[in-house]
Amino acid sequence: MAKKSMIAKQKRTPKFKVQAYTRCERCGRPHSVYRKFKLCRICFRELAYKGQIPGVKKASW
């Protein structure tokens, strides 16, 4: 879990546009966040396996 201070800091508008970054909405992780779902890869995988993300299913070929 991310520190509450880092989550609060990220919500503020940055002084420069390039300083903005994405965080997982579920756990607050700053790395490997899918923009479309606003989830990190770990949370995405957990929710996809449970079937809680509509339209996502395990690939097989």
UniProtKB/Swiss-Prot annotation:
An example Gene Ontology CC term for this record: small ribosomal subunit
Entries under InterPro entries matching the protein: Ribosomal_uS14, Ribosomal_uS14_bact, Ribosomal_uS14_CS, Ribosomal_uS14_sf
GO MF, one annotated term: structural constituent of ribosome
Cofactor binding note of this UniProt entry: Binds 1 zinc ion per subunit.
Sequence positions that bind Zn(2+): C24, C27, C40, C43
The keyword Signal belongs to this UniProt entry's keyword annotation: no
Record keywords: Metal-binding, Ribonucleoprotein, Ribosomal protein, RNA-binding, rRNA-binding, Zinc
One Gene Ontology biological process: translation
Cofactor(s), names only, from the UniProt record: Zn(2+)
Assembly and binders: Part of the 30S ribosomal subunit. Contacts proteins S3 and S10.
Role summary: Binds 16S rRNA, required for the assembly of 30S particles and may also be responsible for determining the conformation of the 16S rRNA at the A site.
NCBIfam families, sorted: PRK08061.1
PANTHER family: 30S RIBOSOMAL PROTEIN S14, SMALL RIBOSOMAL SUBUNIT PROTEIN US14B
UniProt record similarity statement: Belongs to the universal ribosomal protein uS14 family. Zinc-binding uS14 subfamily.
Protein name: Small ribosomal subunit protein uS14
